[in-house]
């Protein structure tokens, strides 16, 4: 049993207008203080380019912490970070935990299956009780789009909220670590052609990446996939849509592959995984259509032989494992920035 964005227990709330690219609950910008500083990180949509660049610049300073003998800085000493994962996660939850620990915070991972929400307590009651325990920062993953917004709206004034993925809406720290990875290898966003390939309809990563890429001035963003897996509204965002993988990959500098999110699909949107790979899988032959120095990315988890060939995933143009490494520094930067901004 999960808790919907109204605080009631039951099935996850449906995303507002799921076939469209934008979501109805995004009113104003609750992420920013009155002074325009970042209090919560809920979505990349609506963030000024200056804040996105500030996060990336700060992350660059934290990358070197990994190479130190003592991999800690005292930035969040005395602060309490609560990881509230209402959806299963390994990679994201672990990197947030590592990032908070390296900032010297006290970290608590809430066991959702054993928590009061599984016994009928509302989401807001749970949040209020945790706030009373003097939590400073909530890292939230939830099946319902908008749940982190609800928490940010109702939590205690001193508490900060970071969205670690909500429904199919947004995954802002993944989008930011993807931007950091691209900047690390390509430097200048204003000269790039970036392709996002696969199940874009159900992907919160794709939404965050597209908002980040357009915010940072990428002149050409391509969405490539079958018609059944592309949302409406992409063209209005300035995204070029391709329904042929070979055509879409021609000359691109960055390829971001996405997995099929079968757990979010209703009905038969696709043939078998084998047939999908034949048409939409990234093989060495298809990679050769991109720019010679193109990089290949994937937010994980990765399904070899479905959306990507092992030769590509493990090849010299793949930067997938580096995304994971950079993710720790990016999440350190986000937590350090939001916890230092209060209104």
From Swiss-Prot:
Gene3D superfamilies: Aspartate/ornithine carbamoyltransferase. InterPro entries: Asp/Orn_carbamoyltranf_P-bd, Asp/Orn_carbamoylTrfase, Asp/Orn_carbamoylTrfase_sf, Asp_carbamoyltransf, Asp_carbamoyltransf_Asp/Orn-bd. GO terms for molecular function: amino acid binding; aspartate carbamoyltransferase activity. Carbamoyl phosphate binds at residues 91-92, 141, 171, 174, 300-301. Pathway: Pyrimidine metabolism; UMP biosynthesis via de novo pathway; (S)-dihydroorotate from bicarbonate: step 2/3. Its EC number is 2.1.3.2. L-aspartate binds at residues 119, 204, 259. GO terms for biological process: 'de novo' pyrimidine nucleobase biosynthetic process; 'de novo' UMP biosynthetic process; amino acid metabolic process. PROSITE patterns: CARBAMOYLTRANSFERASE (PS00097). Pfam families: OTCace, OTCace_N. Keywords: Pyrimidine biosynthesis, Transferase. GO terms for cellular component: cytosol. It catalyses: carbamoyl phosphate + L-aspartate = N-carbamoyl-L-aspartate + phosphate + H(+). Heterododecamer (2C3:3R2) of six catalytic PyrB chains organized as two trimers (C3), and six regulatory PyrI chains organized as three dimers (R2). Catalyzes the condensation of carbamoyl phosphate and aspartate to form carbamoyl aspartate and inorganic phosphate, the committed step in the de novo pyrimidine nucleotide biosynthesis pathway. Belongs to the aspartate/ornithine carbamoyltransferase superfamily. ATCase family. PANTHER family: ASPARTATE CARBAMOYLTRANSFERASE, ORNITHINE CARBAMOYLTRANSFERASE, MITOCHONDRIAL. This is Aspartate carbamoyltransferase catalytic subunit. It comes from Burkholderia vietnamiensis (strain G4 / LMG 22486). The lineage of its organism: Bacteria, Pseudomonadati, Pseudomonadota, Betaproteobacteria, Burkholderiales. The gene is pyrB.
